[in-house]
Amino acid sequence: MHILGCLDKPTSGEYFLEGKDVSQLNDDQLSWIRNKQIGFVFQGFNLLSRTSALENVELPLLYGGSDIVASERRKRAMGALASVGLADRAEHHPNQLSGGQQQRVAIARALMNNPAILMADEPTGNLDSRTSIEVMEIFQALKAERGITIVVITHEPQVAEYGSRILTIRDGHIVSDEPNFRRRLARYERNEAPVAEGSAA
């Protein structure tokens, strides 16, 4: 995930993102990609405890040096919270939210710069099974509504089943890379359009 998310450079091989060889980019270019093109969601929610859900969601625009005025920043943050069903919790602090709600705030924060790719590292690792389903359904809705490519790293087979493509890694090596035919069949049975190739979860 660190290589895919441009947090690390590969020590060998090549990684092309939108036609660019990531290993040839400098730190400023990599930082721009991380801030503008990729959103991150982690197992730990990484929310600031003394700030509201709304303020936590605004952070990418503040840290990214955006010149968006405060009113527009707030409007976008509210929209992101609404997209994950938390508009009514905007003024709540993390300790006033359940684990699932905190993860939804983290997802909303990851959406603030309208990324083309969302990287989710064990996003359900700290959640119970019911809440895990809710989070994965949010990812599915975002994929359908926004066309975002979502990459989910998980040890849970039932979570992986939400993906349209499943890569299995063992001991640092990809041992399988297959389309999720069961999920595609379910979509066709519901008369839904299949997810485009190359997207996950």
Report each predicted region and the residues it spans.
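ABC family nucleotide-binding domain
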Residues: 1-163, 168-169
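Conserved beta-strand-loop-alpha-helix hinge in the C-terminal portion
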Residues: 173-201
